[in-house]
Amino acid sequence: MSERQAEACAAAGADAIGMISFPRSPRHIDHRRMRLITSNLPANVCPVGVFVNENFEKIMATVETGRLRAVQLHGQESPDLVEALSAEGLIVIKALFVDGRPALDQAARYPASGFLVECAGGPLPGGNALQWTWSDARRISSDRPVVLAGGLSPENVGEAIEAGIPDAVDVSSGVETAPGQKDIDKVTAFCRAVAANDQITPRRIFR
């Protein structure tokens, strides 16, 4: 994702911009480019770094260089790491899955700001366009902030919101022409579809 694409996503109505710090991913963005992206975002858009099994020091170095306000942890990170990052004033979102299946029963272990729930059945963390039963998210969304992901697109995000009642939704491949290349028309359509269902989302994470 380029600086221009990030700015266009923000203008389309995105509440947050996710940037993946994971070299194996085709969407990987190094911390220097993160800073270029975050420097041009409006104050009401939250820059989020996505990490996979990274240690506290590496995450914080990227947070500081990239000027991130939130982190999304997509691996087997410990509750202690979540607590340490939260103590730094960060919004911490923990992805919940075990062996490619949503692991909603693990939420109570983590002092996180919110939880990303998806099927996680692909070869890389996130962005695999795999759908699952979105209504399963209701098992925790009633009392814990939830970010819903997994096979979302402009055509189905309204249905997903109605099914899972999340605080936010996370999309990647559903609005891309290629990994990391956003289709701004699709982003705009996606944001409009989310806004049309805004009245049923608790919004406990980014607003």
Residue ranges of predicted features:
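Conserved N-terminal beta1-alpha1 strand-loop-helix module at the mouth
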Residues: 1-207
